[in-house]
Amino acid sequence: MTIKKRTKPEYWESAKKILRSRDSVLRSIIDRTDDLKYLQKTCTPFQTVANAIIGQQISIAAADSITKRLKKACGTINKDNILKSSSVELKKTGLSNQKVKYLKGLANHIDNNRHYFKALEIMSDNEVTENLCKLYGVGAWTAEMYLIFQLLRPNILPLGDIGLINSINRIYNIKNTSIKKNY
């Protein structure tokens, strides 16, 4: 599957304008951020889910390191390369036993359901989440990452994302880490 480069989502400029007008902290961040760098699609749907699985409950640096080793071991991260790699080979990249099972399960599912990702494109956010969460090892956070980074859906706020929570705490100087309770 080829990766189609795309421009900003149609809602992007309007969303930035609203956020800039309502929050001076976000205005400052928006004004100094190159949003095109973050909006470029660089992964296939399979890679987006695989990357989210790899990144579950570990730091971005750790996930990047494992992903680099996985690419070195497998080549392109896709269902075929995951399926042909042994669990031992995958574990050597730093993946846990569970994440190896999750990736193998994802690869098997996509191998048996070739139009799975295409079908997700036309579903509502809730339907996408429900469908993805049926996959072994995929929960709400992974589904939210897919909605954000693959489908570029608006109005997704992953309040279970520790990186997001830590960033909000840092930029707003919040000492209480129970942000989810406030929203």
Residue ranges with predicted function:
Residues 161-183:
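C-terminal end-helix/capping segment
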Residues 41-57:
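Alpha-helical scaffold segments that form or flank carboxylate-/histidine-based iron centers
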Residues 124-169:
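Catalytic DNA-binding helix-loop module of base-excision-repair DNA glycosylases/AP lyases
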Residues 5-8, 43-46, 80-82, 121-124, ...:
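Short acidic alpha-helix initiation/capping motifs at coil-to-helix transition points
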Residues 49-54, 103-107, 146:
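Short alpha-helical scaffolding segments that buttress acidic/His motifs in well-ordered protein cores
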Residues 33, 110-114, 171, 175:
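A short secondary-structure junction motif
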Residues 59, 63-136:
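Alpha-helical ds-nucleic-acid-binding substructure associated with the helix-hairpin-helix region
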Residues 1-41, 174:
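Intrinsically disordered, low-complexity, charged terminal extensions of DNA damage-control enzymes
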